[in-house]
Amino acid sequence: MATNEQIRDQTLVLMSRYQELITARRFDEWIELWADDAVCEFPFADPGRPSRLTGQAEILDYMKAYPETISIEGVQDLQLHPGLDPHVLVVELTIAGTAAQTGRPYNQQYVIIARARDGKLAHYREYWNPLVSAEAFAR
């Protein structure tokens, strides 16, 4: 049986790999990091956009469309904060990018709460500033 330290290290590696693959847009590899029944939540999703995705297929379909929405020039200030529960990790990061439809800057800060199970991402909740999104996408 794995120790809390080993589980925590595994969770850190999982989320580091997550960031690497999503930034590179290697979605077919990226989705393999997720549990089959994973849940992905966006509590501040824009009206008309999904706030909850369930399962690999829904999550992959959603994320494959993001390059048509946001052109990411870089990820900055990436900070990984392990939780007391070794399966939980809080992630902070800033994305520098451009909204594809408007050409406006999309410089967004995120806070993510991720929970792993059996070495896979089981639950993911992503928070961002909806005012930045509204400005970038002219909503």
Language-model segments: which ranges?
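Short beta-strand edge/turn micro-motifs at domain boundaries
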Residues: 88, 111-135
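Short, cysteine-centered beta-strand-loop-beta hairpins and adjacent loop/turn segments enriched
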Residues: 97-107
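A short hydrophobic beta-strand element
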Residues: 85-95
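Short, surface-exposed coil-to-beta transition loops
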Residues: 74-75, 105-112
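Short beta-strand segments enriched in hydrophobic/aromatic residues
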Residues: 34-35, 93-97, 112, 128
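Short, low-complexity N-terminal intrinsically disordered segments enriched in polar/charged residues
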Residues: 1-36, 138-139
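A solvent-exposed, acidic/Ser-Thr-rich amphipathic alpha-helical stretch
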Residues: 33-86
